Amino acid sequence: MKKQEQNQFLKEFGISLIKMFPKYIDKAIYSKGELTLHVKPTNLIALMKILKNHTNCQFKSLSDLCAVDFPEKKERFEIVYNLLSVRYNSRIRVKTFVDELTPVPSVTCLFQAAGWFEREVWDLFGVYFTNHPDLRRILTDYGFEGHPMRKDFPLTGYVEVRYDDEQKRVVTESLEMTQEFRSFNFTSPWEQIEISKPNIKEKK
């Protein structure tokens, strides 16, 4: 399938999906050769089942699942699902939006790959996935506090993890935010060049 034909197919496919399942899809956006569907968290599983099992869809592969944090928005977390249809050689993106307290239903019942993806989003952003079989941290250390990919998470973190040579083990200590004295009295490179001034005599 040529690129122009594929783009036209995705446009028509998006229109058809909205007509067939208007109660599941809030919005369909086609931009730069990509189709994106917006869905409420409560309708996520139903829409994913359709996209995976419908004869004209066959998006059986979840190639990626990630999150984006927009602190200025009421529903600050944007959860993004990237699906692939090998049969029709096409991709589609599904987005849902939640705040800090609203959970998202897990899609592990449909896509096995979602297990680690959802754990990563939970670990880094704090988005909770209901009905996940093993929702634990996956990248940060045991006992880690907070979710480091949130925009309001401090760059230095809350604690320091280091190896103590005396105790011969890894220790966790509260982070001291005191800053060492720094001298900002730097000489400008232009000030190092002495320019001789012309000898100007006053006229009497």
UniProtKB/Swiss-Prot annotation:
Record organism: Reclinomonas americana
| HAMAP family, alphabetized | NDH1_NuoC
Q: Which gene encodes it?
A: NAD9
Q: This chain belongs to which protein, by name? A: NADH-ubiquinone oxidoreductase subunit 9
Question: Partners and quaternary state?
Answer: Complex I is composed of about 30 different subunits.
What domain of life?
Eukaryota
Q: What class of enzyme is it?
A: translocase
- Tell me its EC number(s), please: 7.1.1.2
Family membership:
Belongs to the complex I 30 kDa subunit family.
Keywords from the UniProt entry: Electron transport, Membrane, Mitochondrion, Mitochondrion inner membrane, NAD, Oxidoreductase, Respiratory chain, Translocase, Transport, Ubiquinone
